[in-house]
UniProtKB/Swiss-Prot annotation:
UniProt-annotated stretches for the region Disordered: 614-640
PROSITE patterns: ACYLTRANSF_C_1, ACYLTRANSF_C_2
Organism: Rattus norvegicus
Protein's recorded name: Choline O-acetyltransferase
Domain of life of the organism encoding this protein: Eukaryota
GO MF term (any one): choline O-acetyltransferase activity
Coiled-coil segments: none
Lineage: Eukaryota, Metazoa, Chordata, Craniata, Vertebrata
Gene Ontology, cellular component aspect: axon; cytoplasm; neuron projection; neuronal cell body; synapse
Amino acid sequence: MPILEKAPQKMPVKASSWEELDLPKLPVPPLQQTLATYLQCMQHLVPEEQFRKSQAIVKRFGAPGGLGETLQEKLLERQEKTANWVSEYWLNDMYLNNRLALPVNSSPAVIFARQHFQDTNDQLRFAACLISGVLSYKTLLDSHSLPTDWAKGQLSGQPLCMKQYYRLFSSYRLPGHTQDTLVAQKSSIMPEPEHVIVACCNQFFVLDVVINFRRLSEGDLFTQLRKIVKMASNEDERLPPIGLLTSDGRSEWAKARTVLLKDSTNRDSLDMIERCICLVCLDGPGTGELSDTHRALQLLHGGGCSLNGANRWYDKSLQFVVGRDGTCGVVCEHSPFDGIVLVQCTEHLLKHMMTSNKKLVRADSVSELPAPRRLRLKCSPETQGHLASSAEKLQRIVKNLDFIVYKFDNYGKTFIKKQKYSPDGFIQVALQLAYYRLYQRLVPTYESASIRRFQEGRVDNIRSATPEALAFVQAMTDHKAAMPASEKLQLLQTAMQAHKQYTVMAITGMAIDNHLLALRELARDLCKEPPEMFMDETYLMSNRFVLSTSQVPTTMEMFCCYGPVVPNGNGACYNPQPEAITFCISSFHSCKETSSVEFAEAVGASLVDMRDLCSSRQPADSKPPAPKEKARGPSQAKQS
């Protein structure tokens, strides 16, 4: 994912109203180019006989006057009529059609630096400061005063579509029986008093942040949060943990929501949740373990229903978690916006809080504020049954996730840049080497690439398991051949160049995944039967991303994490820093073939070997400082 920077000083900073940016439309790649690239991406990942069969299928699909050309013409017509020809297809395919539960399977989390709260008041001061930052940031959005993002990295200096920012606080993912709906509040007039929903002890409270046309100060917010904590502690008033329902599979939650909506009180309460700015989850202590790994798990799934897993409402785009034990961060419903937008927003909030925290926030007592309101949710016997089922399934998610935060500190992006390499490409090749070492094969790999250079652009896929990467990893693991280091280095450079070329293809709208997706979806309307092209095992395999990766760089102390996207897969989110690289590695215990600790150790070993390979041709003064023979893996106290 390309790194973002604010507009360079030499360029005028424009308001970020996405309607005002004169961005080009996403281009439609040439059909034959996409088909050739598809075959090139898959040839080395499937058996030879299977590839020959797929090659013939692709040839028939792309033949002159054939189905491929017909679909391509339809797609070009769609490009003319829409702002972005793939956005609807992509949103449905990536998110809204997915029936899996949101925690771990879909919703990523950003984990802040651990906080050291002395008491509950410290926790609430932090939460009040965070809410104040949210309101300040929302003011920038409402006034279209947010500076435009500009691309950095490959093809830097281009303005990026800002539309996603306007969904941060105005979106809600409504569960459906077969497909979810992404709802956006579009009203330009001021709605009812703006409010945040505060979750505390699995109860939900309405915190009005504007009262009598005045935005509440941090002191006011602190006062109101103290009232909420007191109200939540009243066990006589406690309601069932309805938030658990949002952690269930999407179809199951849609069914449970239909039951809830039969009651008018529930309808009003759900409406307040669905229209809120964001959630703030005041969590109780977790397991007592406060490593990066355990804090990340608290954000990803809350530790299940016995800890903080019910203190959530997963449909809301942003849930800010402020834990009594100092575990803080944000859980993101991913469908409205991409990770880099979340990081930009979060870094803005943390900078606001660093400035604000220089003064001690005390409760304001100038005027008596109306008490926050507890949301009433009536629970029928049928809903009780849904809750029991949801709790059991969330517990299965918690037990099944195999997750580790691994900080590789032998070197970071400073050393990689000294080699004249892209840190992202270097790390991607290291991930391929790690996977090959463990499994003696490469697999379809997903790396998100921003296409925000275009109107309403989201992402496409960099397929980093290239033939060139395979040649390199085979050379690095074939100890019998004894290939000279100089030849291995040349293979590394070739693999890096292949990754760079595919990255440029992706960010300029020329990659294959979105294109093939659109052709497949157009075929649904045009063909009575699914075309053999999209039923072929090679195509189906190409969309099972056993390795799901993303670079999410930050300038502040925080990191992003998510779960695998297939049952036998690994998630690998990484954050390159000058002298270290933080990896969040995920897999499922239910797959006996995978192990997150083993994969993290293999990544560390691969990065060390690649450093040593680079150092073999360097003059002494440019070698990395204090070479280390081995990367200590998670089992050697490297787990964060």
